[in-house]
Structures are given as C-alpha cells and as structure tokens.
Amino acid sequence: MTASLSTHQAAQDSSRHDHLALQRAGLRPLVPAKLPLHLVETEGQLQIHTASYRGSFSSVLSQAVRSAGLGSRVVIAQFLKGGVNQGPDGQVQLCGGLSWLRPAVPACVSEPGQPQVEEAVDAIWQICSQHLRSGEVDQLVLDEVGLAVALGYIPEQTLLAALQQRSTAVDVIITGPSIPPSVMAMADQVTQLRRGL
C-alpha cells in the first residue's frame, strides 16, 4: 500500500529534518522569535446621544439590554423620570445584569427648584458617581443628565469632574437634550438625531 504526504505534512517533515541536521552540526536554527501577547485593558468610551425631541433614548436602551444580555453589568439612570416605588431602594433588575434607577418622585420632573426632587435626583446621582469612580459596572447610561444640569439639580462642574475622574473601564452613555458644551467636548462619540434633512 502506498501513502502520500500532503504538501503541509511534507513541509513539516522537511523542516524537522533541517532542524536535526543543524543540531548535529552544533548549530541552532533561526526561528523567528514569537513576541509575547500583551493584553490591554479595554478603555471605556464616553458617548452622547442627543436630540431636540424625544427619541435619543430608545437606541441606547436596546444597546444596554443587549449588553446586559451578553453578561455586562449595566446601570440605566433616568434623572427626570419618576414613578411609583422608584428611588435607590426601588431599582428594577432586568436581564440579570441590568439595573434601572429613577428618582423617588411621583411624576416626571420639568420644573427647577423643588427640594423633594433635588434630594431624589441627588440620591440617584450619588449612586451613579460611585459607579463612575469604582468601575464596578461595564456600562452606565445617564439619561437626561443634561436637563438635570440645566434645571439646577446637578452642578455642571460636578458632572464634569465625575466624568474626568471615572474609571477607565466604564462605558458612559449620555442621552437627552441640553448636554453642556463642556461635556460634549469630552465625548469620544456624539450622535445627534435631527429631523427634516
């Protein structure tokens, strides 16, 4: 019975014989050095999705749910949306890894200078700023944080400092209108939705 070697097998055998011949002569074969593989920690990005109308949140929501479904730890914080049983103690858990936070106010916020709202928004902000510093989540969605700044519930400098000092592993996605220009300048990616083009 006759067997033939494939071209790959023949090349391997030839290479093996060459190495043996070099060793018998007291020489070492020139083998290209394999560089060690260096794994680099992924760096989180700051993304902004903004529009002058409703709609910038829906695409981000689907991205957050998809990330959580794939095992990422995701937090969505909606700063101006209230509802029944909301607040830090009433956060909703979805997909195993997604937490949804809203302030403990009975309705959506649209007016500045309400002390109860200020406390409720600050409670959500404190949780978010802790996540930004610690890096214990993979993705943090800050919905309507620009409006919270515009209404005076979160100082712009506080938001800027938290974003500048955030853990490098956290992806931050800011959605909604009225994003301060200083925050826009920090962004790695800005998506602006427009009508009538």
Label for each model-derived stretch:
Residues S110-Q165:
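Phosphate-binding/switch loop-helix module in NTP-utilizing enzymes
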Residues A51-S52, F79, D143-V145, G176-P177:
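Fold-independent oxyanion-binding glycine-rich loops
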Residues Q45-H49, V74, D138-L142, V170-I174:
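Generic beta-sheet signal
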Residues T42-L132:
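Conserved P-loop
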